[in-house]
Amino acid sequence: MKREDCICFSGSAGGAEAEFGAAAERYGIDEVNFTFEGHNNARLRGLRVLTKAELRHGDVSLGYLSKLMHRKYPDTPMFRMVLQTIWHQVDNGQEIFVIGKINPDDTVTGGTGIAAEYARLFNRPVYVFDQVRSGWFRWNGDAWEN
């Protein structure tokens, strides 16, 4: 695959998102960072500020998401907008790479766990670097495989 055929879709947050973006920049890969007004952006390269209408397009029921992920999420405007930007990242991506911990129920812990779940729902190839097991895993449709 050629670097000019790749784009790193991210959310401009610190941590793993910023590191993926920095790696993309080092290797000459285009970068699009979905964000919203008022978000604290760690990456400014390729910043794409979503409109309110675009954010609404990525809206997901918190009740549905909580049931799917087996955890409770805050019902705040800021959290909803973060979820909506994650939806846009996954919707635009062809393959999804996240960092976190794979749980016994096959969900992934951490903010990127939501991206992994969206990827599974959108039938996108998804890869998780499990920080506990120090290795990459791929979702095969039924389970995570090393």
Q: Where would I find each of the regions flagged by the language model?
A:
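Acidic/glycine-enriched connector segments
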Residues: 1-145
